[in-house]
Amino acid sequence: MATRRKGMSPEEKKEKLKEFFHSNSTIYSSKDVESEASKYTGMTQVQCKETLQMLIDDGVVNTDKMGSSNFYWSFPSFEFDSKKDKIIEQTKLLSETKERIQSETKKIEQLKSERVESETRTKNLEKLQTLKDDNKSFKEELLLYADSSLIDDKKRDIKIAIAAVNRYTDNISSLRQFCDSKYNIRPSDFDTSFGIKPDMDYLEEYNFNDTPQPVNKKKRK
């Protein structure tokens, strides 16, 4: 009688129970497996029953029902045949994979041979590369605008510029009125003489939303 072993891993249990079956190549009933295998392996009957099911799932142990009883058996040749079948299956799969690779390689080579170099294709490739370069530049530029301090600086510059434009507009308007009252120079003649456009007007403060948009210009009274 073998000494009971404790702490065997599932793989060790399967190996020990398989060894029990292969030691005498006998067909066992459920009761015989649980009692005799328990003595041989040092496992409890419950452990033997659980391990037996794992070996059945692995295809190492065969089982069949005769009458009201289940019988179990496993011969060394079973494992050999199982491994042999797996080798055959994997060999077949490898062969099919190689054939697919060869087939796809031929298709690729055929497509390459059919692809005719032309001036149009060359230009399109150059255009594509240019677009890729532009896209990269735009992305780099967008990263600059992700800097909040830079955005704040731009907003401040815009406000200063608008204030300056409105100051100059005020000065021009005052000078136009002065020339009209002092020298009887009509505003239209004044504008023509100094190249001032008829639509010159004050600028309204800029609205800074999530996406800055210019506000329509309105005339100041």
Swiss-Prot record:
Keyword Nucleus: yes
GO biological process, one term: reciprocal meiotic recombination
Location within or outside the cell: Nucleus
GO CC list: condensed nuclear chromosome
Coiled-coil regions listed: 89-146
Single GO molecular function: double-stranded DNA binding
Keywords assigned: Coiled coil, DNA recombination, Nucleus
Source domain of life: Eukaryota
Pfam families membership: LZ3wCH, Mnd1
Entry similarity comment: Belongs to the MND1 family.
Function: Required for proper homologous chromosome pairing and efficient cross-over and intragenic recombination.
This protein's name: Meiotic nuclear division protein 1 homolog
Designated gene of the protein: mnd1
